[in-house]
Amino acid sequence: MSGITRHSQPSLRAGVRLQHDRARDQWVLLAPERVVELDDIALVVAQRYDGTRSLAQIAQELAAEFDADAAQIEADVIELTDTLHQKRLLRL
């Protein structure tokens, strides 16, 4: 993992934006010269990357919203965040 913890407060890097792609009818992260398609779960997490909320806070919000296990959601949020960070789409 690349130093991501439950206390990390990620945001989209400059030049990366969350956008609905009408041609694909799918939400994507649009970055210079590439597009990353998001599934429904990745979308609800990515919508919360604002640079102010920690991953623990995001996980707690999602656990409450979806009535799910907070520990499992936190692990999944950290894993997704690590993947997107490795693709250079996020800053911490």
Swiss-Prot record:
GO MF terms held by the record: quinone binding
Keyword line: PQQ biosynthesis
Coiled coil location: none
InterPro entries: PQQD (IPR008792), PqqD_bac (IPR022479), PqqD_sf (IPR041881)
One of the GO biological process terms: pyrroloquinoline quinone biosynthetic process
UniProt xrefs under NCBIfam families: PQQ_PqqD
Record function comment: Functions as a PqqA binding protein and presents PqqA to PqqE, in the pyrroloquinoline quinone (PQQ) biosynthetic pathway.
Name listed for the protein in its UniProt record: PqqA binding protein
Organism: Xanthomonas euvesicatoria pv. vesicatoria (strain 85-10) (Xanthomonas campestris pv. vesicatoria)
Gene it is expressed from: pqqD
